[in-house]
Amino acid sequence: MPSPTKAAEAATKATATSDCSCSAASVEQRAPSNAANPSSSLATSGKIGGKTQDQTAAINKQKEFAVPNETSDSGFISGPQSSQIFSEEIVPDSEEQDKDQQESAPQKEQPVVLDSGIIDEEEDQEEQEKEEEHQDTTTATADSMRLKHSADTGIPQWTVESHLVSRGEQLNNLGQSSSTQITGRSKVQSSTASTANANPSGSGATSSAPPSSINIMNAWEQFYQQNDDGDTPLHLACISGSVDVVAALIRMAPHPCLLNIQNDVAQTPLHLAALTAQPNIMRILLLAGAEPTVRDRHGNTALHLSCIAGEKQCVRALTEKFGATEIHEAHRQYGHRSNDKAVSSLSYACLPADLEIRNYDGERCVHLAAEAGHIDILRILVSHGADINAREGKSGRTPLHIAIEGCNEDLANFLLDECEKLNLETATYAGLTAYQFACIMNKSRMQNILEKRGAETVTPPDSDYDSSDIEDLDDTKMYDRFGDPRYFVSYNGGNPMTVA
């Protein structure tokens, strides 16, 4: 009799086949009872006499599947088929979820970059042009200018070798819009034009003009920067006396106000040109629109400094009218940016306002020239309308008082002989005329000269004090006594603050 375990295993395998018929299922149910006796199965088939042979064959075939031998089971139905069933039930669901997630997630488009190679060619061309420009600028002559603090970085050779007029041709005139004087800039323009012609459609590449080493539109920003002392290259050029460099720097200035930049001691390029006795540079600066009334830290203008130094050419450069040739040259050189009003006013008025400017000591140009004994300077100033009777700001002395104080007979004779507007009776702030001042100073020779020229011989007062001055003197002594800090120190060892 078969064991119940094998019968149950056979029943389980039979239920896994879903495509079997109902008759086969009924035979499978009878299989456990007939498995022990094969003859009984034949009897059973004999009982089913009404069935056809095909049905009988199907029943026998079903028996073979229902009751297999122990060695006939390959595990195909129990193992792989069952795993395939589970995989068919689970895996499709996970795949469908992955597909849904992929469809719901947005797809990022990757940009497509098309390199035509034109940009690389332009960059190589720019590098080659920069190398050529660097070679052109580094081939400077032995007398090239070198400025302080590396202020000449990038200065091309044309700036150093430029002149006001060279063989009748104008150099570096910024007023000409079509000017292509910088070699590097012309090369860049030609290369840009060739690139545009080579690629007229402009498809796939963007062509732009590469910047030159020095942009002529903002070159003044580089050449008008101040160093640690506040000096610009124009200041340094005025000190060195290089007229050509000064003219080139002036042409770069878009406005005359750049010519009035002051250094740390409030000196403009015009001040430095006066201190170094550069009349030609002073004339060029004035024609270009430089302001002659700017003061330094002591209140001196360029004319004050020239009067102190006794430089006649510099004084003439600051006071004489401009000729027609100079005005025409100024308009030709600097007319593109110079203030026409400034040029016209300088050419028809001889700077009378500058002649009467006082410095911070209250002295005018005539006082400074008289103190230094520069008769020629005084002659120039008087010929241009300077006030010879002007009083200085401290004590009210005139140039005649200064000549008497210094016992300068030559200066006194010049004032008395050549200055028609000289007033001998002009008094100081103390009310002393020139003759009275000579009496107080015990200048007998000067008194005789003044008497011969018609000065009033009024003696000065014997004393400047009256009865009230004695009381004032007593008050002064009282103040000197109690105002002395040592007085309070001796008073119980105190000090002025504790006693007060």
From Swiss-Prot:
Keywords in alphabetical order: ANK repeat, Cytoplasm, Developmental protein, Phosphoprotein, Repeat
Compositional bias ranges of the Acidic residues kind: 118-130
Main localization (coarse): cytoplasm
GO terms of biological process kind: antimicrobial humoral response; dorsal appendage formation; dorsal/ventral axis specification; dorsal/ventral pattern formation; negative regulation of antifungal peptide production; negative regulation of canonical NF-kappaB signal transduction; negative regulation of hemocyte differentiation; negative regulation of Toll signaling pathway
Biased composition (Polar residues): 69-86, 171-189
GO molecular function, one term: NF-kappaB binding
Keyword Phosphoprotein belongs to the record: yes
Modified residues (Phosphoserine): S45, S144, S395
Subcellular location per the Swiss-Prot or TrEMBL entry: Cytoplasm
InterPro entries the UniProt entry points to: Ankyrin_rpt, Ankyrin_rpt-contain_sf, NF-kappa-B_inhibitor
GO CC terms of this entry: cytoplasm; cytosol; neuromuscular junction; subsynaptic reticulum
Low complexity: bias regions: 1-43, 190-212
Disulfide bond annotation, renumbered to this chain: none
Region Disordered: start-end pairs: 1-148, 171-212
Tissue expression as described in the entry: Expressed in ovary (at protein level).
ANK repeats: 229-261, 265-294, 298-327, 361-390, 395-424
Post-translational modification, as annotated: Activated IKKbeta phosphorylates cact.
Family: Belongs to the NF-kappa-B inhibitor family.
Quaternary structure, from the entry: Phosphorylated isoform A binds to dorsal (dl); inhibits dl translocation to the nucleus and therefore from binding to DNA. In vitro, interacts with IKKbeta. Interacts with cactin and kappa-B-Ras.
Function noted in UniProt: Involved in the formation of the dorsoventral pattern. It inhibits nuclear translocation of the dorsal morphogen in the dorsal region of the embryo. Acts as a negative regulator of the NF-kappa-B (rel) signaling pathway. Cact is degraded by IKKbeta, this is essential for NF-kappa-B (rel) activation.
Name of the featured protein: NF-kappa-B inhibitor cactus
Record gene name: cact
